[in-house]
């Protein structure tokens, strides 16, 4: 059975079961198996009994591919309190057997302190070693570091595109089966520079070669073109939206929620100035139906580990928007779920709720959220982490804070008087009333 085709067709459980018995001898099965675990959307869809139980059984026998796969599932799914510890143990076991992707995965545990320890030098060492050994996961991390910036350094999308081009040229020269992620990240790196509509072919190629996340990007490209504000429901937009939902793409569910939110906004004005019980009832029923669709789509996306969906659910409860009942506790829970999955935006909003005593938690937890946010790249929460440390808290993270965060905080370009860094940002994260602030284009990028 062609393992690559199972990957491209989205038959992930079948791929696991086809590849596991032949991983030691079949290089194509190895590569297809490892590529499945490059996609969060694919990994969270794996059936526990059909795929995860066999992986656990093989991991316990010392199979390094199974150890790595089980570690990735635990890391991406995060279904329990011990998920990251289980992930680390299995990733370490696979890395000790020199599986390149496991070395890359281990690098990320040191990069972000998943096991409580941040060590950027160790992360760099492991990532470079994995990359030189041919790890595709390491290559993706290197591209993302250029694409989104790293350790509070600016993004370099042109270098991300350059590396993606090199990887595409290499696979063509070596006549390897295409990796859809190289096309995906080349498109991501180029879309702001040359326009979203000019990278559609790369996103289409990514989808063809096993990147389900590309559904969301194609929905945006065909629906919004090079504009993030005006939706035109073209036949291509509708096609990829429906196909994405059919294939359980988290981003497709989120995009359908975004479309329905626009419809809800329009419905709120419908019949507003007209009298009559019938008109009022019709408007109410239409708004209720729209709210139910928004709730359903956001919930589905969140269950598929879409952090933007957790943030949007939190916003809906926080503001009482789109027919949601205003509920601070539910907002807090939604943001907390986003934090479990490393959402910077959710960490900032959660921290502000506690800072403003909308939800009371002990100061240790408030500080813990701050240092998580600092690790993930929040300039606001880096500042709060350093301030907490200066006030005698977070002493268990002395080395991490003094080595990494103090120098950034003390740099001349990082000023508390600079709106882009800190001043004013706190109020923009969650305003006290009205609609969510579009502080940095996150919402427009999706909606």
Region roles according to the model:
Residues 1-29, 46:
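N-terminal leader/linker segments that initiate helical-solenoid repeat arrays
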Residues 10-13, 44-53, 81-90, 117-126, ...:
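Structural signature of tandem alpha-helical TPR/SEL1-like repeats
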Residues 22, 58, 93-94, 130, ...:
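Canonical positions in the second alpha-helix
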Residues 25-30, 40, 60-63, 76-78, ...:
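Short helix-capping/linker turns of helical repeat alpha-solenoids
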Residues 35-41, 69-76, 105-112, 142-148, ...:
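Hydrophobic face of amphipathic alpha-helices that form TPR/SEL1-like repeat modules
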Residues 402-447:
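DE-rich, low-complexity intrinsically disordered acidic tracts
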């Amino acid at each position: 059975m062609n393992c690559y085709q199972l990957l491209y067709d989205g038959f992930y459980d079948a791929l696991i079961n086809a590849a596991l018995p032949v991983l030691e001898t079949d290089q194509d099965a190895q590569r297809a198996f490892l590529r499945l675990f490059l996609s969060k959307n694919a990994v969270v869809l794996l059936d526990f009994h059909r795929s995860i139980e066999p992986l656990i059984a093989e991991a316990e026998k010392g199979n390094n591919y199974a150890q790595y796969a089980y570690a990735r599932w635990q890391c991406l799914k995060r279904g329990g309190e011990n998920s990251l510890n289980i992930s680390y143990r299995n990733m370490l076991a696979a890395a000790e057997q020199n599986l390149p992707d496991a070395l890359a995965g281990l690098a990320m545990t040191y990069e972000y302190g998943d096991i409580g320890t941040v060590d950027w030098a160790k992360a760099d060492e492991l990532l470079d070693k994995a990359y030189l050994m041919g790890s595709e996961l390491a290559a993706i991390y290197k591209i993302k570091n250029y694409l989104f910036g790293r350790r509070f350094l600016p993004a370099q999308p042109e270098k991300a595109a350059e590396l993606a081009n090199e990887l595409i040229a290499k696979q063509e020269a070596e006549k390897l089966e295409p990796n859809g992620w190289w096309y995906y990240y080349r498109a991501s790196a180029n879309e702001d520079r040359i326009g979203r509509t000019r990278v559609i072919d790369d996103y289409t190629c990514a989808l063809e070669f096993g990147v389900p996340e590309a559904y969301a990007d194609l929905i945006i490209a065909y629906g919004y073109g090079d504009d993030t504000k005006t939706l035109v429901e073209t036949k291509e937009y509708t096609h990829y939206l429906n196909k994405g939902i059919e294939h359980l793409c988290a981003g497709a569910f989120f995009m359908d929620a975004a479309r329905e939110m626009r419809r809800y906004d329009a419905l709120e004005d419908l019949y507003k100035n007209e009298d009559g019980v019938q008109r009022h009832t019709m408007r109410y029923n239409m708004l209720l139906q729209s709210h139910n669709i928004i709730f359903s789509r956001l919930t589905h996306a969140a269950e598929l580990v879409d952090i933007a969906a957790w943030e949007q659910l939190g916003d809906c409860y926080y503001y009482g928007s789109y027919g949601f009942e205003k509920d601070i506790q539910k907002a807090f829970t939604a943001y907390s779920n986003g934090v479990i999955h490393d959402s910077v935006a959710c960490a900032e909003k959660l921290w502000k709720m506690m800072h403003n005593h909308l939800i009371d938690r002990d100061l240790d937890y408030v500080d813990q959220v701050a240092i998580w946010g600092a690790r993930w790249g929040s300039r606001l929460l880096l500042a709060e982490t350093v301030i907490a440390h200066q006030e005698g808290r977070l002493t268990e993270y002395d080395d991490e804070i003094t080595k990494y965060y103090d120098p950034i905080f003390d740099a001349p370009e990082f000023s508390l008087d600079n709106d882009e860094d800190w001043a004013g940002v706190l109020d923009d994260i969650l305003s006290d009333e009205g609609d969510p602030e579009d502080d940095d284009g996150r919402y427009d990028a999706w909606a």
